[in-house]
């Protein structure tokens, strides 16, 4: 599909302005999300005194609500008033992030993180569909590269902000600061006039359940989100447990660990996302399934590097191999998300993203933090994180299978498969 949906072709200047707003919001999204793992050791030392399993479950509580809420926001993302849903989501997650700083018990903290999940679900399901409506297929990977580069950069800032504030003023203050910018960004997104999806009427005729059933009949879509689930299992484990891992396995302080990991995440995420988007666009001119081949191959190459990083006793080897693994992992960010929205009609894009969010978190980073924490409680954190490279292999292999399957079908067959 080479069309830009909506009643009129949107001016390029306006499209890049919308991209800037949505990217800033995505940055805040991941700052709020990754402040929690940055201050996890501080929470453990506090009066809350949770176990590793309980810390892992706090992430699971956020993600569990996030994935359940996402399918409800999917149909809203294919309707005219979708920016209002995004603004409401931003306000909710920002307030809930700040409320986490007021928690006096672990159940209260779990409740605050769960509310963050509802707010972020609204934004994450709808914003890629809005962005896709401003950019045609041949320029979409570039736009998505910028948008999704905010994911690792925001996570890195969450690590650095959380670690710095926790070390100087305490973990509660980190939550207060992270939640503060939300209202301003919510106001900005209300000023965006997103084009109405051209095929929205067709989606309304099917209804939400009919739309999701139609998506699940697409065999390539199923393979993509299953591979994405394994990918999310791995990245979720890395995101939650790496600050703890490097402190325990290599004896670094909280500030040093979060600064090192945050800097690494920002650089690899930015280079990987932008490089993957630009490379994917070039390869797409020659191969229709270039996005999937690129994602599958780079992910498979990352697996042995991650295994070395988690088993070495040398911190220099750990940092170098983890850097290389993360760079390869983030290369697929723009291509795989571009493929997801290219695969379906414009009026089903938000629903496709919502169903993807539900699946990848249900099978991915909902179970992985708790599983790694459970293994750590019974052995060591070094043993717990070894499930991560296994998941990376599963992800890459599944995407290569999806590329092979898509290469055997015509464009029309892929969309309707």
Regions found by a protein language model. Give the residues of each.
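Juxtamembrane intracellular "pre-TM" segments in multi-pass secondary transporters
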Residues: 5-11, 196-225, 249
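Residue-level signature of mid-helix packing/kink "hotspots" within the transmembrane helices
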Residues: 30, 34, 63-71, 121, ...
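Extracytoplasmic gate region of multi-pass secondary transporters
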Residues: 36-37, 218-274, 329-333, 337, ...
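Helix-breaking motifs and short loop linkers at transmembrane-helix boundaries and internal kinks
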Residues: 49, 81, 102-108, 119, ...
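Conserved MFS/SLC helix-loop-helix module at the cytosolic interface between two early adjacent transmembrane helices
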Residues: 68-104
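Structural signature of the two symmetry-related core transmembrane helices
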Residues: 84-98, 291-306
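Cytoplasmic helix-loop-helix junction between adjacent transmembrane helices
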Residues: 112-151
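Helix-loop-helix hairpin linking two adjacent transmembrane segments in secondary transporters
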Residues: 147-191
